[in-house]
């Protein structure tokens, strides 16, 4: 897979198909400044944490991600590109 710059790290979770991805939310992306409950994540994707000011937050539906914040997402390989698109600046 070719992965764009906003992915900081990616790790396979044990023997499962699932992967944990750390991404940065880019200014102008679909994900920033919207309540998480309004974001359409792929069906088998979970937003596990938001890293804000060097502190890990467990996200709630009313929470919004700010540009430049990193997040940890759990997803399946088939959904990585869609997840990445949510965090990438719209062209």
Where are these regions (language model features)?
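Cytosolic Rossmann-like ligand/nucleotide-binding regulatory domains
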Residues: 22-89
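Flexible, Lys/Arg-rich cytosolic regulatory linkers and terminal tails that connect or flank
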Residues: 1-28
